[in-house]
Amino acid sequence: MYPKITIDINKLRDNATFIKNLCEKGGCKTALVVKSMCANHDIVKELDSVEVDYFADSRIQNLKKLKDLKTKKMLLRIPMLCEVEDVVKYADISMNSELDTLKALNKAAKTLNKVHSVIIMVDLGDLREGYFEAEDLKENIKEIIKLENIEIKGIGVNLTCYGAVIPKNDNLSRLCDIADELRTEFNLELPIVSGGNSSSIYLIDKGELPEGITNLRVGESMLLGRETAYGEDIIGMNNDVFELKCQIVELKEKPSLPIGEIGVDAFGNKPYYEDKGIRKRAILAIGQQDTDISSLMPIDDKLEILGASSDHLIVDVSDSNTSYKVGDIITFRMGYGALLKGFTSEYIEKELL
């Protein structure tokens, strides 16, 4: 059935191994981020043999699905108070930035007779999660170390995801300095200094990843074969692991300019149309509800995506060398947004090759 995402599992496994080896070259361990695939068990179990330190996801529901796999589990998103019991049950380690949440995790861990490991997040300017002021961080560390069922395993930072701040040697060196200060002041080991995500990968090849960084959380680079600070492909990696295949449900020649007064579309946007005369247009059975249309790229480079509503994708096929007909399949490469939404959609099948 269509639409469907195909996954070349051998290429994905090769990418995961490449990332693990690259991180080792940079002197750090790897957490493979599987959230963009909704931690699809059939896929992630194929990566278990790569033997990285952690599988990482933002949703505890996804980590719960992976409980039978040997690789440890890392919760990326700082926990909600309503899920602390599940966090202790299904995550080997979680990222945190709120004392009240850590107290709740401690209580849940005590009830479950477990010690829960945590990474304390530091904000170095991207302005998402983490302690921003050094004194605030240290005052909270004083309280956290009193929690008998919580073990501080390390500190971490998020960069690029919200504020688009690019990881550099100087800001990641600051993270290492903070770790050293905490080790000295509080007699902590802090084996994990997590220096960000796929946007930090480029520093390894440049030889600029600080020695004190011991962990990277890598998702997009593994999936799409590129670093995310500047969007460059990584030589030696596969960038065609995932493809989206959609079926044509209508194929007709129509004017390129809508007829009548133009208002706003289904999403409140006022579209712009260029008058190119009569064009052959294919309607595909997929839409904005299913994926991020803006990050789809047709394999047939003679095709042009014109736009989409909730359930329909309109493609100009006039210039293609292929004579398309109703029922034919059009294949797309997928960017990060398309992949993320596509895996989340229950209306798109997933097929391992």
UniProtKB/Swiss-Prot annotation:
How does changing the pH alter activity?
Answer: Optimum pH is 8.5.
Q: Which residues bind substrate?
A: R128
Q: Which UniProt keywords apply?
A: Isomerase, Pyridoxal phosphate
The GO terms this record gives for MF are: alanine racemase activity; ornithine racemase activity; pyridoxal binding; pyridoxal phosphate binding
Q: Which residues carry this modification: N6-(pyridoxal phosphate)lysine?
A: K35
Gene3D superfamilies of this UniProt entry? Alanine racemase
Function in brief: Involved in the ornithine fermentation pathway. Catalyzes the conversion of L-ornithine to D-ornithine. OR could also racemize basic amino acids such as lysine and arginine. Serine, asparagine and alanine could be also converted by OR, but at a lower rate.
The name of this protein is Ornithine racemase
